[in-house]
C-alpha cells in the first residue's frame, strides 16, 4: 500500500475476534456473551457452534436471560444445585467451572414425531456440557460481560436413557452403540475417556482455561508477541537506514574490487569491513523472520507463522545469496584463473542487496529530500559502474599489447610508463604504470563527460573495444540523463500518481486538522480512517469506474461485489438472477473505523445493514445490549411496518468494519416488483437486532443502590412532625381532594359570586369555592389563619354541632333569631339570601350535598387502578420494572398551581379595570369642582330611564319620584359572610315617605331599628351639612372572593325624596320591618356629624369610591323602593319556616309570586330614605 507503511494501527476492540479464534482452536467448543450490568444478564452474542449445540438460531438466543444459564435448555434431569451454583457465580461476578446437563432442541420429522396435523414436533435431547463462567472486565476494571464457554462431554459420561428419549428416538441397541462409539472417537484425539465416576470431577480441572489469557473488553493497540518487531518502530527504522547505507557500500566496492582485481586477503582492513557487512546482512535476514508486515487489506500481520512463510516466499533466497562470504572463499585460493576467479566474479551477486532498497522504496518516497538524494546517488552509482567497466577495457587492451589505448596515453602523460616482465610460466606481465587512484579518477571523469554530453576530448576512445563501449555508454547516459534530470517530475507523477494523490489527500487532512485545531485523539482517528479507506479502495472511485460500464455489465460487477451477502444469508437463496441484479444495483458498500457511530439514538432508520467483516456494539442507555459480528443483520423490518422508525440505541464500530447497506425506499421498490421473492424474503430474513425496539431494563447498580437506600431509611430515626411548622402550613394550603362534583364549574361562571351590600345593619356576602378541600380539625384552623393573613374575614363565632363541610359545593351560613333549626338551602334567586342575627347567635354551617359514600367508592376505584397499573409489566425480560402513575397529591398540587395562576391573572384584570374607573372618576370630579358646577343635591334624570351609579346617588338625594325596575336573578349559593364595617352618612332634619310591595319571597331591611344588632362595635359616622344629600347607610366590604369576576353595571331606577339613615335593626325573611332609632343613637349620630367634614366635593368622592366597590360585588338582580319607603328584595325560594316579626317600624310586604322577578311599588312611611343597590 503506497504511503501506508504503518498499516492500520488504530486502537481496536478485538475482543470478539480473539474469543472466536480461541474457540475455533478447541474442538466442539462454543460460547455465549452476556451483559453483566443489566438485571437477568441478557445474552448479547452467541457463536455458530452454540447454535448447533442448542438447536436455536442466533435471533432466538439473543436477549434471553442468562441468569439461569439458558433456562430454555433446562429439563427434568437438570441438577438444581448446579443451577443455584451458576446463579451464585453470576451474582458475585466470579469465575467457576462445572458440568451441567442441558437439553437440545431437535426438529424431528418422522412417523413417531408427527402430530395429528402432520406437523413436525419439537423434541429435546439431553447432553452433558462442561460450562466455564469467566467475568470480562473493561479498561476501568469493571465487569461488563460474562463469557460462558460450553464443551460437549456427553461421550465421556454414562449414557442418558430417559422415557422420552426412548419413545421419541426409538433407537435400537445397535444404533445407540454406534452413536456412542462415533461420539467417543471425536474426543479420543483430544481428551482421555473417563469411565470411573470418581474421576469425572477432575474433568473440569483438566479442561480449564487459563485466566491469564482471558482478553478484556476494551480498545487496545495491536499487540505483538515479545519476539516480534513492529515494522514501523524506531529501532527498525534506524536499522533500515543502516542497511541502505551498507547496500550502497556494497554496490560501490563490489564493482571496484572486481575491476581492479583487488584481493581483500592482501588488504586486511577491507577484509574486516566486508566481513562485518556480511554479518550485518545476515542479522537482517534473521530480523526479517521476526518483523511484522502490512497485509493486503492494510492490516498489520503479527502472526509468526504467517511472517515466516511470507518472507520465505519473497526475498529470502536473494538475501541469502547476497550474504555469502565470497571474500573468505577467495582468500584461500591462490589460483587466478581457476575457481578463485569464479568466486571473485560471484561477488557481483552482492549487488542483489539493492533489492532491499527497492523493497523499502515506498518508505523513502514519503520524503522529498530523500527522494532527490536517492536519484543523485543512483546517477553517481551508474557512473561508477561505467568507470569500472572503462578501466577493465583499457587494462585488457594494455595486457594484449595495444599501446595506443587510453591507459597507455595516461601513463605517458603522467610519466609513469608501463613495463613488461617476462617469465617462463606466465609470459610477459605488465607492471608499473600510473597509480590506481589516477586510473580510477580518469575513468570516472570520462564516463561523467559522456553521460552529461559535454565531451572535452582530453580522454577519448581509441581502440575498437573502447569505441563500442563508448557508443553504448552514450545511449545509456542519454536515457539516464533525460530520465533523471529532464523528466524527473513527469516520471514520478506517472509512476506514483496514486501515491501523489494519496499524499495530497493526507496533506489536506493534516492541514485541515491544524487549521481548525482539531484535538489530537480525533485527528488520529480521522487519519486512520483515511488510511484504511485508501487501503480498501486504492484511491479508486468505484462509482466513477462503474459508470464506464453498460448497465448489464455494471449489474454483474455489483453482484460480484455483494457476493458475500447473497451467499451467506438464506433470504436471498430463492431470489432470481434478475432480482439479485436489481438488489445489487442498490447496495452500497461502506467502511467504518473503530469508534464510528453508525446510528444515533432517535435517528431515522432508513437502511438495512449487513456486516461483512468486523464487529459492532449496540449501546442503549450507556449499556451494551448486543454485539454484532460477521454475518449479522441490523436495521428495521421495513417490509412489515411501512412507517419510518427511530433508532432506540447507538451502533458503534469496535473494529474496522465493512458494511453492505441498502436504502429503505430501494428495498421496498424491489420487493414490490418481485412479489414472489418478497414473501420468501420476509419469511427467511431474521434481523439479529431490530434498532426500533427499545429494551426496558434495570441496572444492577441501580438495584443495589435502591436496596442500600431502603436499608438506610429503616435505620434512620423518624423525625417528629410539627403541625405548626411554617412549611407545613404552606403545604396544607395547597392540598385539594379529588374532584367529585362537576357542578362546581358552573358555580364559578355563575352570577352569584358578588356580595350584596345593604345598609341598616344587614350584612350578607356570597363566596363560591369551586374546589373546597376536606379539612380536618388542625387543617381547618390553619385555613382560617390563612384567610386572615390574606386580608379576608372569618366568622369568629364557634361552629355549631350540626355544621358540615361539603366537597365541591357551597356552604350556606344562615343566622337565626332564637332557637330555630338549621335549614338547607339548595338555590337562591337573588343575592343576599343569608342574613345575620343578634350578637349572641352563632353562624351555623349547613351542608348542601353529602357524598361520603360516593367519595369512598371513587377512592377505592382509584386505588384499584393504581394497583393494576403497578402490576403491569413491560414486554421485556426485566420483571422488576413497574409503571407508576402520578400520585393524588401530585395531581392536586398541579391543579392548585394552575388555579392560582388563573386567579392571579383575574386579579390583575380587575385591578386594571378599577384603576381605569378611578381615573375616570377623578376626571369627572375635577369637572364638578370647577366654577359653575354648584353644590346642589339634585341630579338630572336620564331620559332613557337608565342611570349610572353616580346618577343613582344623586337621584337618591332628591325628593319625589319612584321607579319600578324589573330584574331577574339566576340561582346562586351563599356562604358565610364576614362582618363588615358600616359607614353612615346622614343629614339631620330630612324626612321622607313612601310605601312598597315586593313580589316574591325574600328579605327586606327596615329603615329604623336598634343599633348594634349585627356589629355593635361598628363606628357610626354622620355628616352634617346643607348639601341636600339624605342619610345613606353604606357598607364597605373589606375582602372579596378572589375568583369572583367584576359584574357589569346594573340599571337602577331614579328615586326622589329625602332619606334619613339610622343604624340597622332586626333582619327578617320575607317581611319588611322598621324600628325608630333610640335617642342615644340619634345623639351619637349628632356628635359624629359635628366631627365629619362638610365639603360636598369630599363627600362625593368618598361616595364614588364606595360605589365602585358596590358595583364590583353586586348581583344582577336589584330592586329599589321609593325614597323614604320600605324596600324589599325578592328571593327565588320561600323559606319553609315563618319569618319572625320585629317591632319598631311600619311597613308592609306582600309576596305575590315565587318567581325570580320582582316588581316593587311603594306605599307607606319610614324614618329615613334608603338607596338600595339590589
Curated annotation (Swiss-Prot):
Transmembrane stretches, start-end: 227-246, 269-291, 314-335, 343-369, 372-393, 471-493
Residues modified by carbohydrate are: 262, 412, 424
| Record field: compositional bias (Polar residues) | 940-949
Motif Selectivity filter, which positions? 453-458
- Start-end of Low complexity biased regions: 815-833, 965-977, 1049-1093, 1149-1167
- Annotated segments matching region Disordered: 742-763, 778-842, 865-884, 930-977, 1022-1097, 1115-1174
Give residue ranges for domain PAS.
43-97
Q: Which residues lie within the membrane without crossing it?
A: 442-467
Q: Name one GO molecular function term.
A: voltage-gated monoatomic cation channel activity
Composition bias type Basic residues, residue spans: 1034-1043
Which superkingdom heads the taxonomic lineage of this protein's source?
Eukaryota
Q: Name one GO biological process term.
A: regulation of heart contraction
Quote the record's binding site residues for a nucleoside 3',5'-cyclic phosphate: 571-688
**Which residues lie toward the Extracellular compartment?**
247-268, 336-342, 394-441, 468-470
Extra info from the record?
The segment S4 is probably the voltage-sensor and is characterized by a series of positively charged amino acids at every third position.
Q: What does this protein do?
A: Structural component of a potassium channel. Mediates the potassium permeability of membranes; potassium current is regulated by CaMKII and CASK. Has a role in growth of the perineurial glial layer of the larval peripheral nerve.
What is said about its interaction partners and assembly? The voltage-dependent potassium channel is a heterotetramer of potassium channel proteins. Interaction with CASK.
Protein's name in the database: Potassium voltage-gated channel protein eag
Organism classification: Eukaryota, Metazoa, Ecdysozoa, Arthropoda, Hexapoda
**Annotated gene:** eag
